[in-house]
A protein has these predicted regions:
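Membrane-integrated ABC transporters
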Residues: 1-44, 59-71, 89-93, 97, ...
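Transmembrane helices of ABC transporter permease
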Residues: 25, 29-42, 75, 148-199, ...
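An intracellular "coupling" helix at the cytosolic face of ABC transporter transmembrane type-1 domains
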Residues: 28, 117-118, 134-143, 147, ...
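Transmembrane helix-loop-helix hairpins at lipid-water interfaces of multipass membrane proteins
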Residues: 30-88, 165-170, 268, 281-285
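Helix-loop-helix
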Residues: 60-73, 163-177, 247-320, 325-326
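ABC-type nucleotide-binding domain
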Residues: 341-506
Length: 625
């Protein structure tokens, strides 16, 4: 079931209270806007009085040219005032609405940036986009028209009631008796209308998510010749949206029909009761004309409010969906007494660390104790789902530990500011994301203000300088959306260059060579070794390639959230049975030596290179002979 159907709806009064602080910022503009609205309203109210004066004068046979000119001049002046007030009301009101929309979108985006990975794991980007674009546009219209409409309606209804009572109290009471009944029906239909609009907004978010998925994955779509699958997914989403929108229009039709019926009822009452009053001399012809005009004004005002209900409910829906974003708790945040992280060496300690995801009670990490020395090059290996990536995601606090603690140079990561922590930890994801822009902009992304020389130096250290200079526009080459104009290896090296430009003391790399060919893998691993060797950066490398793990100073084997082995490559790789039990590919040289030991040899299993293996075999053969 969709969120539109399961979440309880907040009251309109609650939503308006959430919205008022944004409007209060522009209360001066709002006051002038309402002043202009009052002027236009008074001008509208004056017209029936002019017509009554003119009609009564005619009936008294006292009409003169002077009277006509005076009334015409008054009407002309009122229309000039009305036109000027309408101009400012329309322009200033909409501009105020745009300012409010901008402020709300800024706050929503700022809040989205502070939300953690869990929120994005469970929320479609298409839904988020709908909330900060279409929904807030409806809020703009609401912010402008809502105060105006209710202010104008209040003046017109009150003025009409007073003036109509002056003409005929009994007739006025009969006419206004229809209003409460109309209000009850309108409130009931309004609730249904709001629910339809919410469902409509949710469904357009789902459709946006489907479109985004298909367009961003168009290379995969074409690779699998899956255009028909995507067409069907889109068609289904489109049909669902069509169905919801059809139901919305049915609700609107019922709403508008009820309005017209009540309009007709009020006119019927006026014609019947007013005509009888005129016949029996209870009201003059001029008063009846004015009465009909004021009733028309009253009915037009009520109809305008009722028609505004659609826009009102759209605005309420937009505010509600905005509030849902703002009410999403920020679970990863600075502690009240957080201090900047001070990194001198770059040592990392995991002290009895356990972790489980918020929406899953299965422990992903179980009492992990691990000390990574400053400047050490560590490889994490193990099967998929063993906890390697999760362990590394805890270092920059993409998630918080559920047990134990993580220390960097003796400082608990939960006690330091996120900005300083993530500025000291460089992270290169397996699925590299480059922003739409130039190579230079992507390298400098984590360090705004970096000079061109610093950008080029970072690229050189990452092994990217040569290929970047060979591009058509060098460092000013546009990389395309998500870096589609670069190869996998090029994107990886640009990403590493971006991390280097940050000047971190620790780098975490999650399968950085998973999608590269052997040549690309060699270049990336050589870059990592150079960073570790020349700059003393602590390196944590997650990899499935044992040939890469061999080159690390230390290898840690993980499975089911636990550390199974920890040591140098020559200490870990001889544990053939352990490695194979967790699905790891043991180096061929080690497997050869291990097999020989199974048939009676007693060979050391730490000969990792081909040359070392050959030397061990020659020595063993010599000893046998």
């Amino acid at each position: 079931m969709s969120e539109a159907a399961t979440n309880p709806r907040p009251k309109n009064s609650t939503l308006i209270r959430r919205f008022l602080p944004y409007m209060a910022k522009y209360r001066g503009v709002l006051a002038f806007d309402l002043f202009c609205a009052a002027l236009t309203t008074l001008c509208d109210i004056a017209l029936p009085s002019i017509m009554r004066t003119l009609t009564n004068t005619v009936s008294a046979a006292a009409l003169t040219v002077e009277t006509v000119l005076r009334l015409a001049a008054l009407y002309f002046v009122l229309r000039i005032i009305d036109g000027a007030a309408s101009y400012f009301m329309s322009g200033i009101g909409h501009i105020m609405g745009v300012h409010i929309e901008t402020d709300m979108r800024r706050d929503a985006f700022d809040h989205l940036l502070r939300l953690d990975h869990t929120y994005y794991n469970n929320t479609k980007v298409g839904q988020i986009m709908g909330r900060i674009t279409n929904d807030l546009f409806d809020v703009t219209e609401f912010a402008h028209h809502c105060p105006e409409e209710f202010f104008i309606a209040g003046i017109k209804i009150a003025a009409s009631f007073v003036i109509l009572c002056q003409a005929s109290v009994p007739l006025t009471l009969v006419v206004f008796a229809c209003v409460p009944l109309m209000g009850v029906v309108s409130v009931k239909l309004n609730r249904k209308l709001r629910e339809r609009f919410r469902q409509q907004r949710f469904q357009i978010g789902e459709l946006n998510a489907t479109i985004e998925d298909s367009l961003l994955g168009q290379r995969v779509v074409k690779a699998f010749a899956a255009e028909d699958i995507e067409r069907e997914k889109f068609a289904q989403g489109n049909r669902d949206f069509e169905q919801i929108k059809t139901l919305s229009y049915h609700a609107m039709a019922a709403f508008n029909t009820s309005t017209r019926l009540f309009d007709g009822l009020m006119y019927f009452v006026v014609i019947l009761a007013g005509g009888l009053s005129l016949v029996y001399g209870a009201i003059s012809a001029g008063d009846l004309v004015a009465y009909v005009l004021y009733v028309s004004t009253l009915i037009a005002t009520i109809r305008r409010i009722v028609e505004f209900a659609e826009q009102f409910q759209r605005g309420m829906t937009g505010i509600e969906r905005f509030a849902e974003i703002m009410d999403t708790p920020v679970t990863i945040a600075d502690a009240p007494d957080a201090k900047p992280l001070v990194v001198k060496d770059g040592g990392i300690d995991f002290d009895d660390v356990s972790f489980e995801y918020p929406d899953d009670h299965n422990k992903v990490l179980r009492h992990v104790d691990l000390h990574i020395r400053p400047g050490e090059n560590v490889a994490l290996v193990g099967p998929s789902g063993g906890g390697k990536t999760t362990l590394c995601n805890l270092i920059p606090r993409f998630y918080d530990v559920t047990g134990g603690k993580i220390l960097i140079d003796g400082q608990d990561v939960r006690g330091v500011t996120l900005h300083s922590l993530r500025g000291a930890i460089g992270v290169v994801q397996q699925d590299v994301y480059l922003f739409s822009g130039t190579v230079a902009e992507n390298i400098a992304y984590g360090r705004p203000g970096a000079t061109r020389a610093e950008i080029e130096e970072a690229a050189r250290l990452a092994g990217a300088d040569a290929f970047v200079r060979a591009l058509k526009d060098g460092y000013d080459t546009y990389v395309g959306e998500r870096g589609v104009k670069l190869s996998g290896g090029q994107k990886q090296r640009v990403a590493i260059a971006g991390v280097i430009a940050m000047r971190p003391r620790c780098i975490v790399l999650d399968e950085p060579t998973a999608m590269l060919d052997p040549h690309g893998r060699e270049e990336v691993i050589s870059t990592i070794e150079r960073l570790n060797r020349e700059m003393g950066i602590t390196v944590v490398l997650i990899t499935h390639h044992m040939t890469e793990a061999i080159r690390a100073q230390r290898v840690i084997v993980m499975d089911a959230g636990r550390i199974l082995a920890d040591g140098t490559p020559k200490e870990v790789f001889p544990q053939v049975e352990l490695l194979e039990s967790v699905g790891l590919t043991v180096p061929a040289t080690t497997k050869v030596l291990y097999a020989l030991n199974q048939v009676g040899f007693d060979l050391p299993l730490d000969a990792l290179s081909t040359e070392e293996c050959a030397q061990v075999l020659l020595a063993a053969i010599g000893a046998k002979t």
